[in-house]
Regions:
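Positively charged n-region of N-terminal signal peptides that target proteins for export
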Residues: 1-3
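Gly/Ser/Thr/Pro-rich low-complexity, intrinsically disordered segments
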Residues: 8-215
Length: 215
């Protein structure tokens, strides 16, 4: 199923920006699935278990209570200023047949507390087309691979993957690419883009993940 749509003339085309590569993918909400696991799993595991043909890394956290990803979900809900959120109402689990649709809340504010899954990240990059203030520190000034989730309408989400970009440079860049809302996800060595059963962007040593976004 071809779910990738052209956003602008550069959509799904590698673009050189200071020797970096970047990709923008538009995905209809109805075609998006979130997969959560018990603990950390390799990309190959997701591919084999769920017949994944497209995926990207997702959240810093999931709603599990395991190892380094023990969170946080309940704590974050009580302290909503700690992280920006995307609230996702349904998701796919490895041991159930849950509904696979998601709802993208484009205000990126406090999530629906009835949500079954919440994807978190930091910082918030754009909100309603407005560039958000980003503190200048080692994290935001470092040029690293990054993954961003966002949107420009209510019918689709946008995924942005860059091989090297500073977070402080994201607001202007993402506005140029047509984003209205955007949030930085886990990135750096976790940045991954797998499309049409091909690793489009990956690290030399693949990491394992608590959850992925697939379509």
């Amino acid at each position: 199923m071809k779910t990738l749509l052209f956003l602008i003339t550069v959509l799904l085309t590698t673009v050189d920006i200071s020797t970096a590569r970047e990709w923008v993918i538009s995905i209809p909400i109805k075609d998006v699935k979130m997969v959560s696991t018990k603990g950390l799993k390799s990309p190959k595991w997701f591919i084999s278990k769920f017949n994944v043909v497209n995926m990207t890394n997702l959240s810093f956290f999931n709603s599990k209570y395991i190892g380094p990803y023990k969170d946080s979900l309940n704590y974050d809900l009580r302290n909503p200023k700690k992280w920006p959120f995307i609230s996702i109402d349904t998701f796919c689990t490895e041991d159930g047949n849950d509904s696979l649709g998601i709802i993208f809340y484009n205000d990126l504010s406090i999530p629906n507390k009835n949500s079954r899954f919440i994807a978190s990240g930091t910082p918030l990059i754009l909100k309603d087309g407005v560039e958000q203030p980003i503190k200048r520190n080692g994290f935001t000034l470092a040029k690293r691979p990054r993954t961003v989730i966002g949107n420009n309408n209510n019918d689709s989400i946008l995924i942005y993957v860059s091989s090297a970009i500073r977070i402080v440079d994201m607001p202007k860049r993402l506005k140029i690419l047509g984003f209205k809302n955007a949030m930085n996800l886990d990135g750096g060595g976790s940045t991954l883009l797998y499309r049409d059963s091909v690793y489009v962007y990956r690290q030399k040593k693949l990491r394992s993940y608590p959850n992925i976004l697939t379509w």
